Amino acid sequence: MAHVTIYTRPFCGYCSRAISLLNEKGAEYTEIEAGFDPALRQEMMRRSGRNTFPQIFVGETHIGGCDEMVALERDGKLDELLAA
């Protein structure tokens, strides 16, 4: 199973939803809490080109935020991506 990296911030409903979906899938992930750390937030923005939370990477592939991950699940593509 591919390793997931998720950049989050505290008290973020989208972050919580994304983590819940990853847990449902049994995905291995590293959570990087970047909300109050300027260096980590800068790293997230450099990697993703976005400044909103969460930002999710499967391996080195940026899939976007929670809405994009939910769309992949709805379209039946998330399992395949996580299995790679």
Question: What positions do the PLM features span?
Answer:
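Local sequence-structure signature of Cys/Sec-based thiol-disulfide redox active-site neighborhoods
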Residues: M1-E28
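Non-catalytic, surface beta->alpha helical segment in thiol-disulfide oxidoreductase systems
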Residues: T61-A83
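Short alpha-helical
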Residues: G13, A39, G64
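Thioredoxin-like thiol-disulfide oxidoreductase module
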Residues: A34-N51
